[in-house]
């Protein structure tokens, strides 16, 4: 099992490193350049025109590596987690295409995105229950207590799914930020799926736990490889194509490992980023005042004088700590 996990990460890393130099010039020639909002940090204006939609680069690496190294590539677990990733990635691709190619700055309208995201969330939760017997219960973090929600499970977990995928998207605002934080989140899921396989399931009884670990490892390799081109100063951005796909991969792993609530711990950085936006909007609309210099939170620190690399490193460290706490919460429920 460990051999396949390491090889999955290595193969995804290799594919991403090979595709990067091939795809970036193509994206540049096709004028898939990023537009930068003028109200953002002024130093970001220099990034205008940087190729976007680069998420395609690591998505190819993740999918190929996961399928090649999986014990059973056609298992429902593997099909569903890849479908979740690509489904949300497709929404992001359409959004990017409208913004970059059709030059409609807002991309998909908010309600259009939400319809697609909610539909995918309901399909994922229903499919996991109907075909894989995951049930409609939630495992309480740090315990082995299962809270049965019945039909309420679907809207509740769909809310988490849509929230996390959009939160990952919000986090993709600095060079290397989303790729690095997701790398650590995926490392957590390598650990969780591996623990499930070695301990006979733990809080999640899965048929192909090791294949989910292989998928998560492939995502680690893909994100690590993408950082070669996305670290400051970025040569390419992942775009909504990449950020929504990574969010989809995370929620897919969470649903299939029955760690829907633990995901809120593992993805603590995303949660805080999303909350900062919600609080900022609420405060401005109700009082006319802003809580933060700018939201999401990473821009608040930038405008406070931190350089971009410092913000990214602090957020990476926070993501690592959240991941360790999330794995600890999972392990506590195994005993």
Swiss-Prot record:
The chain crosses the membrane at residues 5-25, 50-70, 78-98, 114-133, 145-165, 177-197, 200-220, 236-256, 262-282, 311-331. This is Phospho-N-acetylmuramoyl-pentapeptide-transferase. Pfam families: Glycos_transf_4, MraY_sig1. One of its GO terms (cellular component) is plasma membrane. GO terms for biological process: cell division; cell wall organization; peptidoglycan biosynthetic process; regulation of cell shape. Its EC number is 2.7.8.13. It is found in: Cell membrane. Belongs to the glycosyltransferase 4 family. MraY subfamily. Keywords: Cell cycle, Cell division, Cell membrane, Cell shape, Cell wall biogenesis/degradation, Magnesium, Membrane, Metal-binding, Peptidoglycan synthesis, Transferase, Transmembrane, Transmembrane helix. It catalyses: UDP-N-acetyl-alpha-D-muramoyl-L-alanyl-gamma-D-glutamyl-meso-2,6-diaminopimeloyl-D-alanyl-D-alanine + di-trans,octa-cis-undecaprenyl phosphate = di-trans,octa-cis-undecaprenyl diphospho-N-acetyl-alpha-D-muramoyl-L-alanyl-D-glutamyl-meso-2,6-diaminopimeloyl-D-alanyl-D-alanine + UMP. Pathway: Cell wall biogenesis; peptidoglycan biosynthesis. Coiled coil: none annotated. GO terms for molecular function: metal ion binding; phospho-N-acetylmuramoyl-pentapeptide-transferase activity; UDP-N-acetylmuramoyl-L-alanyl-D-glutamyl-meso-2,6-diaminopimelyl-D-alanyl-D-alanine:undecaprenyl-phosphate transferase activity. Its main location: membrane. Its cofactor is Mg(2+).
